Amino acid sequence: MIKLYKRNPDGTQAYHEAWVTEQGVLEHWGVIGEVGEHQQHSFATGLDEAGNLASVLRKARENGFEELPDSALQTLVIEYEEALDDPQQAERRQALAGDLDEFLGWTGLGCCEGSDDGAGTLEVFCRVVDFDIASAAIAAEVENTDCGDFRRIYQLAGVD
């Protein structure tokens, strides 16, 4: 997968990404925080996977989209209080990491890197391109679910 970003004249940040599927290359683009649009491309004859990805993203790069260095990403943490005697609650919350990874990916905001539990809390770790937009989008996404009772969403200091 290749993820590209660009600041628009109106101040919004756009994303343009592509990844290899069984059918070819899936291209996905939009404004961060929104699902955007996508298009499936067939594999080009004579190109390997890297060449196909480069071909699909060529126009985006020509229009100023660039890969972000890892140092440009922020670590967002969603913290839950865990009932230590309720294994089902822990399983539901850990499954949240997979759901958030998909949500963050389809909205161009980033990815979820997993979760950790202990001392009565569960923390879900995400790498995002914009903490403010991602935290608001995540809060809205989980609001009416069994994972809407998070304690807080915060930015992990010292690792970004």
At which residue positions do the language-model features occur?
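Short N-terminal "domain-start" leader segments
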Residues: 1-23, 59-62, 83-101
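Negatively charged, low-complexity tracts enriched in Asp/Glu with abundant Ser/Thr
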Residues: 1-7, 36, 46, 66, ...
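Short aromatic-glycine-(Arg/Gly/Cys) micro-motifs in beta-strand/loop hairpins
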Residues: 14-39, 73, 98-119
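A short, exposed loop/beta-hairpin motif centered on an aromatic-Gly-Thr core
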Residues: 34-48, 122-127
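Conserved short beta-strand edge segments in small beta-sheet-based binding/regulatory domains
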Residues: 66-67, 144-160
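Short glycine-/aliphatic-rich beta-strand segments at the starts of folded cytosolic domains
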Residues: 72-88
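Short, intrinsically disordered low-complexity segments
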Residues: 107-137
